[in-house]
Amino acid sequence: MAVRMMQGVQAVYLESDAFLVCLNHALSTEKEEVMGLCIGQLNDHGRSDSRLAYAGAEMCTVAKKMEATRIVHIHSVIILRRSDKTKDRVEISPEQLSAASIEAERLAEQTGRPMRVVGWYHSHPHITVWPSHVDVRTQAMYQMMDQSFVGLIFACFIEDKPTKIGRVLYTCFQSVQASKSSEYERLEIPIHIVPRTTIGTVCLRSAIELPGILCQEEQEAYRRIHGLTHLDSVTKIHNGSVFTKHLCSQMSAVCGPLLQWLEDRLEQNQQRLQELEQEKEDLMEELSSLE
């Protein structure tokens, strides 16, 4: 029996509101990497054909499995809080993955669609968009649990030297085992941004929770350092000043633009509501004139 099977993902469709949350999260800090999980659904289509061939008393069964078309649709993301902030590494704890699975189940009940954790994303500040060897091995570990699991990378704070113009690059990948080797290598997956006219409730909540998550990370780091017994008073005062400076920077870089964006969207929604109410009145007048 000969079986041919395609196990990888052929394409990823990322909705624009989820893309916006990922981008805002990646741009929230340029000193450390950030991370999150992607919630969505998998469309897996395929068919199998079986044919029986007889040759005398012998029977040969040939089963052919058509290549399955696996498409990942990402509808929302969950921003994860970092327990250890490092410049070139991010880690997702089993507790965070379990909590994300519970959130996906809750969304599945609300939407009536088979929502699940379909991937993860993280940022690459000031470095290339391509995954590192650690990223490729981490992705391979996730694919051992789910073959359709994908990884997204957002490379930000990249400046074109001649023009001084900043760029943001993004990519989607999976890990495949290299031929004649035990190592893994990246397989780039085509990613498409799906436009949306409105921002979903889940993505809006994630965007609003971002400042609080960043503040919790700073508080945990400060408490961990402040709890050391061998620090003198001057060092503690300095650490407190650094903590205050980081919070003020977050308010300026994250909270302020987020508040302005929400106010702008509220104004747009109010204008749209007035337009719809006026259109309703015009239609009602036209309907009454026909009677």
UniProtKB/Swiss-Prot annotation:
Recorded GO CC terms: BRCA1-A complex; BRISC complex; nucleus
Motif placement: JAMM motif: 122-135
Keyword Ion transport: no
PROSITE patterns: MPN (PS50249)
Limits of the MPN domain: 12-179
CDD domains: MPN_BRCC36
A Pfam match: BRCC36_C
EC id: 3.4.19.-
Keyword set includes Protease: yes
GO molecular function: cysteine-type deubiquitinase activity; metal ion binding; metal-dependent deubiquitinase activity; metallopeptidase activity; polyubiquitin modification-dependent protein binding
Coiled-coil regions listed: 259-286
Binding site for Zn(2+): H122, H124, D135
GO terms under biological process: DNA repair-dependent chromatin remodeling; double-strand break repair; mitotic G2 DNA damage checkpoint signaling; positive regulation of DNA repair; protein K63-linked deubiquitination; proteolysis; response to ionizing radiation
Task of the protein: Metalloprotease that specifically cleaves 'Lys-63'-linked polyubiquitin chains.
Family recorded in the similarity comment: Belongs to the peptidase M67A family. BRCC36 subfamily.
Protein name, per record: Lys-63-specific deubiquitinase BRCC36-like
Gene name in the database record: Brcc3dc
